[in-house]
């Protein structure tokens, strides 16, 4: 907006002189324009400060999601593994911060670069730049550690701590940054912000990361859980699934609400700026990015709410009871799905997104049980499956006007197939699903396989039965009295004396 504020002394002189004393009029015009330029400069500074404050606040919201992940994970595992899963969430943030600082941000946004990987800003050298300031680094770091946090849930309760440390560093330092470069850097080969040679003339519109964050974390978790195998006792004779319930639905609900709160930084915050005008529109005197930010918060909310209610009634029909943890996962599945297209779809379309996301999650969970795939937090199904649906959804429902406002460029660029925009955007999004699946499978799948062969991945069976907390972390997360221990409240054997699974 500041660029529209300008002053021309030559235009002012005739107005000030009135045909006399042109020298004085010229001096007055120069003075007025000088003062005007000073005000315009301060206006530009204010806009910059507002945008950076908005981005910092969004980063703080997304970082708060780490607490949500920690609470969700803690409530979803058995009490004997609580300290372990909490520590992994802390390590995700700490190791991720160091490796994203050293390598990750450079690989993701180091410009000038090629279409595959960035090659500038290692260790934040030569930083900040006019295009990237410190708040942007902080914001992108919170996304990187979110992807790592997703993976930790898939391999919970049976993984050596050193494996967490290795995979978290590798994911945040290399695997995730390269994917984010492809789709979010202006140099990325599939970025919608490219100035030329857009993929299918549209690029990939993965606004806040259904693919970049959720699919990356979900597929990494898929490979980790596949290579490790299910937890002891998860499947009985003949492959019959045995429910290993988490120890605290209270923590699951707390974590879900913290994640919901943080998603208002995750999706609306991905605009990175808020002080930007789009111009006048019918029915309003002024219209800008602040309106798009608000719409994005609304679509995010509606998708999550619809998915939660769909899961509530869907699971009631399938299983015959109301389950709060299933509803929480359904809600998060709706959020993961809408993350791609939250900024470019109408609110009514978000209802479709959430409804389908709930059934995708329930279907993936049913398939996982049939294949004897064990993911304690349903992270691979939720983030991988619902994330993939969100990418497809955007290719179907993205609105032409919103794409033009946010990404600019050719006003006739492809948009959603069901909105009359042809199939090019959808084709680009199918490519995104394929390349993310391939890249993460090759990198993270190989890493987990190497850790498995080196016997650094899974803990010994006796430690798994006893619990990771007492065997690896110096004790349990909760204090128990002698009476509670004697009465079997702390540790009890599930399914009889011959059942190898010990519940807590």
From Swiss-Prot:
Pfam families: Ammonium_transp. Keywords: Ammonia transport, Cell membrane, Membrane, Phosphoprotein, Transmembrane, Transmembrane helix, Transport. Its main location: membrane. It is a multi-pass membrane protein. High affinity ammonium transporter in the plasma membrane. The keyword Methyltransferase does not apply. One of its GO terms (cellular component) is plasmodesma. It comes from Arabidopsis thaliana (Mouse-ear cress). GO terms for biological process: ammonium transmembrane transport. Belongs to the ammonia transporter channel (TC 1.A.11.2) family. Specifically expressed in pollen grains and tubes. The chain crosses the membrane at residues 12-32, 55-75, 90-110, 136-156, 161-181, 207-227, 251-271, 292-314, 318-338, 344-364, 377-397, 430-450. It is found in: Cell membrane. GO terms for molecular function: ammonium channel activity. PROSITE patterns: AMMONIUM_TRANSP. InterPro entries: Ammonium/urea_transptr, Ammonium_transpt, Ammonium_transpt_CS, NH4_transpt_AmtB-like_dom. This is Ammonium transporter 1 member 4. The modification Phosphothreonine is found at residue 471.
């Amino acid at each position: 907006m500041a660029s529209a504020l300008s002053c021309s002394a030559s235009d002012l002189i005739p107005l000030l002189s009135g045909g006399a004393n042109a020298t004085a009029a010229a001096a007055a015009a120069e003075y007025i324009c000088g003062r005007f330029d000073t005000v315009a400069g301060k206006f530009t500074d204010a806009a910059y400060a507002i945008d950076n404050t908005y981005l910092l606040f969004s980063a703080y919201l997304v970082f708060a999601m780490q607490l949500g992940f920690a609470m969700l994970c803690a409530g979803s595992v058995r009490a004997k593994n609580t300290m372990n899963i909490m520590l992994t969430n802390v390590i995700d943030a700490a190791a991720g911060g160091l490796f994203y600082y050293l390598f990750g941000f450079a690989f993701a946004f180091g410009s000038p670069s090629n279409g595959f990987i960035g090659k500038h800003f290692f260790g934040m050298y030569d930083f900040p730049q006019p295009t990237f300031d410190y708040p942007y680094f902080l914001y992108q770091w919170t996304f990187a550690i979110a992807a790592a946090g997703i993976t930790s849930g898939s391999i919970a309760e049976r993984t050596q701590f050193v494996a967490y440390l290795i995979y978290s560093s590798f994911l945040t330092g290399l695997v995730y940054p390269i994917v984010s470069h492809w789709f979010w850097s202006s140099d990325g080969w599939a970025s919608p912000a490219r100035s030329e040679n857009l993929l299918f003339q549209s690029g990939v519109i993965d606004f806040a990361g259904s693919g970049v964050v959720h699919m990356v974390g979900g597929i990494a978790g898929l490979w980790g859980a596949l290579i490790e195998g299910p937890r002891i006792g998860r499947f009985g004779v003949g492959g019959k699934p045995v429910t290993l319930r988490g120890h605290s639905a209270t923590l699951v609900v707390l974590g879900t609400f913290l994640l919901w709160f943080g998603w208002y930084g995750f999706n609306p915050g991905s605009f990175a700026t808020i002080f930007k005008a789009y111009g006048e529109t019918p029915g309003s005197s002024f219209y800008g990015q602040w309106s798009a930010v608000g719409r994005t918060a609304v679509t995010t909310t509606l998708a999550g709410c619809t998915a939660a209610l769909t899961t509530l009634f869907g699971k009631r029909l399938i299983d015959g009871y109301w389950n709060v943890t299933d509803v929480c996962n359904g809600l998060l599945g709706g959020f993961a799905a809408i993350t791609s297209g939250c900024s470019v779809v109408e609110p009514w379309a978000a209802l479709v997104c959430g409804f389908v996301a709930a059934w995708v999650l329930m279907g993936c969970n049913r398939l996982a049980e049939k294949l004897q795939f064990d993911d304690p937090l349903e992270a691979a199904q939720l983030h991988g499956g619902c994330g993939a649906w969100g990418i497809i959804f955007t290719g179907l429902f993205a609105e032409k006007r919103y794409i033009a406002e946010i990404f600019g460029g050719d006003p006739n660029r492809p948009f959603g197939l069901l909105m009359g925009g042809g199939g090019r955007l959808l084709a680009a999004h199918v490519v995104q699903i394929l390349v993310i699946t391939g890249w993460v499978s090759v990198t993270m799948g190989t890493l987990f396989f190497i850790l498995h062969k080196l016997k650094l991945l899974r803990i010994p069976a006796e430690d798994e039965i006893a619990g990771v907390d007492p065997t690896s972390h110096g004790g349990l997360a909760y204090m128990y009295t002698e009476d509670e221990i004697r009465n079997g409240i702390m540790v009890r054997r599930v399914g009889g004396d011959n059942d190898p699974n010990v519940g807590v």
